[in-house]
Curated annotation (Swiss-Prot):
Swiss-Prot/TrEMBL keywords: cGMP biosynthesis, Coiled coil, Cytoplasm, GTP-binding, Heme, Iron, Lyase, Magnesium, Metal-binding, Nucleotide-binding
Example of a GO cellular component annotation carried by this entry: guanylate cyclase complex, soluble
EC number in record: 4.6.1.2
PROSITE patterns in the cross-refs: GUANYLATE_CYCLASE_1, GUANYLATE_CYCLASE_2
Taxonomic path: Eukaryota, Metazoa, Ecdysozoa, Nematoda, Chromadorea
Domain Guanylate cyclase: 434-562
The protein, known as: Soluble guanylate cyclase gcy-37
Binding site for Mg(2+): D439, D483
Gene: gcy-37
Keyword Aminoacyl-tRNA synthetase carried by entry: no
Tissue: Expressed in a small number of neurons, corresponding to URX, AQR and PQR neurons.
Cofactor, free-text remark: Binds 1 or 2 heme groups per heterodimer.
Reactions that this protein is recorded to catalyse: GTP = 3',5'-cyclic GMP + diphosphate
């Protein structure tokens, strides 16, 4: 069926039952939820039937009731999509409307939608004093309930009446094109539209030949046969024996019929529509309300002139029109026109617009339809352009989301939003924040024993776990490089309890690291962590590839504290310990470690043991196993594997020494001795720069700041 059917039933379900029900029906019918049916596309009948069966099941209706409801909504949807005026000007009463259903169906299928599909046919006749009998023929089985809903809604919408539609008979008939379903309906009007009532003419045709006005015409104004042939150049008149009595002037001349005395209709042309009947006089009388289409069996003289050449046209002429009984039913005249709708059709037949009478609407139809085709081509290009733009917009949104994700990965969300808005983000000084620095003391041992792929796998797993804990405890990852991790608290968003959150974060990092096992060594990863608090300066570096950087002596001190920490331990400065003791939010337990001699001076440090108000399981947001301790600190500070790591480290240095010897390289000891001799020679000289540092001596660590 045409896609208009799918669009219409989708609109029906959406309007009456809502988008959720429509999505459920489409999903169960095998379609994606965001599918858009194309009005001009043709869908297999099995797809259409499946949609209606699924819809009936979901809505709790029978399939016949679903088709009947669709028939009622069909008229509503047609009126809302631009067909309202055409429907209202179809007929003056319901009977005439039903009589013209066949021609309207043909127009919609063949001209509006350019479809070759076979639609149903209808016959309407009076039934009793006030009723109508409607015959429905269709090659598709089971669609007859549509007619009941359609007729009821048509009567109510177009003629303001209520009718009762009942099925009288249903059977199968064998026609020329195959088996068709024949259903007979009775249509009864309401009380205001019955015979004898003022509005009866709105229901049934009251025109009869008996009450038609008669005029006394002078014989001098009667139309002669020659004039009639010129007025209707394509007409064909035949008698009950199907023998042609006279024919239009165009057919007479172009097909060489002047000298033919006895010519049957079947010798000149073959019936195309209605396709399911035999061409007999009786059948023609039965289908007077149906559009007839004939195809001529021979080519005109125009086409035979160039027969055999590349320009020869082989398409025969097709005539379309209506049958009208004349001479008290003893003859039938076929008033018709060439069945052409576009300029291309005329060219293929070697016809010309001048071959059609000026009163023939086919001339206007061809020119209007040609204009419509041009408009449709423009609309088609516009639709394709819109689809491309929509696709490009979707791709742009995907790229934008990827860019935003990368931007939010490197800079805090607040700053990222400002950068997206093209605002300048100046550097800020934060007088109070905490800094965490972590590294893996056994990274050298891991790199010797594991392949590069295995190292990447371990680090990736580790950092994924870290990111989750950082987000939970309101920290911000400034940098992750090799085995090092720099995290800040209270930057860029101020946080009154940044020290407490940072210490909980440090405990969580230690625990998560223990959950990662190094391949080949089968040992848990050990971290060492340093925590310090103080002022920093933070800002964006680079415009094309923005990075969030933290500068200041606090960063240097934190790095130094981390380097003096022990594997599996968190070493914090006294400033951090003093800060957390001011608040009663958490109660942390520390062990003194003494003073560290750093370049910036002595720093008192402590080892962090635990948070007495919060268990490890709460910190890492994980469930406690059956055999685990209540607070989790036994597992956190377990020294299992320490000796194995020491043995593995010694073995790793031994391997490197052997490799260096085999490659004829200097050992690490020899390199250190060479370096010491070089330094000794430099100290013997009196050359120095203005700051007192020897020439060529690298300034490894600045006492002022460090850029991460």
């Amino acid at each position: 069926m045409i896609g208009w059917t799918h669009v219409c039933v989708s609109a029906l379900i959406l309007r009456k039952y809502g988008p959720e029900v429509l999505e459920e029906i489409l999903r169960k019918a095998g379609y994606q939820e965001d599918i858009k049916f194309d009005i001009q596309c043709y869908y297999d009948d099995t797809e259409t039937m499946r949609i209606f069966r699924v819809a009936a099941t979901v809505l709790g209706l029978s399939v016949d009731d679903m088709w009947e409801m669709y028939g009622e909504f069909l008229i509503t949807h047609a009126c809302e999509t631009g067909w309202q005026k055409m429907l209202f000007c179809m007929a003056n009463n319901l009977q005439e409307f039903l009589d013209n259903l066949n021609s309207m169906h043909y127009f919609i299928d063949q001209i509006a939608f350019k479809s070759e599909m076979k639609g149903p046919t209808f016959q309407c006749e009076p039934f009793g004093e006030s009723g109508l009998k409607l015959h429905y023929f269709s090659f598709r089985q089971g669609l007859f309930p549509i007619v009941k809903g359609l007729v009821r809604k048509t009567a109510r919408t177009l003629f303001e009446m209520d009718v009762k539609v009942c099925m009288l008979e249903r059977n199968q008939e064998r026609r020329k094109s195959g088996m068709v379903e024949h259903v007979i309906f009775s249509v009864e009007p309401d009380d205001n539209h019955r015979k004898g009532k003022r509005l009866f003419h709105k229901f049934r045709n009251t025109k009869t030949t008996e009450n038609a006005p008669s005029f006394t015409l002078s014989s001098t104004i009667l139309v002669g046969l020659r004039d009639f042939k010129n007025i209707f150049p394509y007409h064909v008149c035949f008698n009950k024996q199907m023998i042609i009595e006279h024919i239009g002037i165009y057919l007479l001349r172009e097909y060489g019929l002047e000298n033919k005395k006895t010519l049957k209709v079947s010798d000149l042309m073959q019936l195309v529509q209605p396709s399911d009947i035999q061409l007999t006089y009786k059948n023609v009388l039965s289908y007077l309300n149906t559009l007839f289409i004939f195809q001529l069996k021979h080519h005109s003289k125009r086409n035979e002139v160039q027969e055999g050449s590349s320009e020869a046209f082989q398409q025969p002429l097709v005539l379309k029109g209506e049958m009208m009984p004349i001479n008290d039913g003893n003859s039938i005249i076929f008033i018709c026109s060439p069945h052409v709708t576009t300029v291309r059709d005329i060219l293929n037949l070697k016809l010309y617009i001048s071959d059609m009478p000026m009163h023939d609407a086919t001339r206007d139809l061809v020119m209007l339809n040609q204009s419509r085709i041009c408009q449709m081509e423009l609309n088609k290009k516009l639709e394709e352009t819109m689809k491309k733009m929509k696709k490009m917009t979707e791709e742009l949104e995907v790229k934008k989301s990827q860019t935003d994700r990368l931007l939010f990965e490197f800079v805090p969300p607040v700053i990222a939003e400002a950068l997206r808005a093209a605002k300048t983000v100046p550097a800020q000084e934060f007088s109070d924040c905490s800094v965490i620095f972590t590294d893996i003391p056994d990274f050298f041992t891991i790199s010797v024993n594991c392949s590069p792929t295995e190292i990447i796998t371990v680090v990736t797993d580790l950092f994924h776990r870290f990111d989750r804990i950082i987000e939970k405890h309101k920290g911000y990852k400034v940098l992750s490089l090799m085995d090092s991790y720099l995290i800040v608290g209270g930057v860029p968003n101020a946080n009154q309890y940044h020290c407490e959150d940072s210490l909980n974060l440090a405990l969580g990092l230690l625990f998560e690291a223990k959950q990662v096992v190094v391949p080949k060594l089968e040992r848990s990863v050990r971290l060492r962590i340093g925590v310090h608090c103080g002022p920093v300066v933070a800002g964006i570096v680079s415009q094309q590839k923005p990075r969030f950087c933290v500068l200041g002596n606090t960063v240097n001190v934190t790095k130094s504290i981390c380097s003096h920490s022990s594997p599996g331990k968190v070493l914090v400065s006294n400033a951090v310990r003093t800060m957390v003791t001011k608040h009663l939010k958490s109660i942390f337990v520390f062990n003194a470690n003494g003073y560290l001699e750093l370049q910036s001076g002595k720093v008192l440090t402590h080892f962090l043991e635990k948070n007495e108000k919060c268990s490890v399981w709460d910190i890492v947001d994980r469930d406690k196993a059956t055999n685990d301790s209540i607070d989790g600190y036994r597992e956190l500070h377990s020294d299992n594997g320490t000796e194995e790591w020491q043995e593995a480290t010694v073995a790793a240095y031994r391997v490197i020494s052997v490799v260096d010897a085999l490659e004829n390289k200097q050992s690490r000891t020899r390199k250190a001795l060479t370096r010491l001799r070089s330094v000794k020679r430099k100290f013997r000289t009196i050359q120095s720069n203005d700051s007192g540092v020897s020439v060529s001596e690298p300034n490894v660590e600045s006492a002022v700041c460090s850029i991460m």
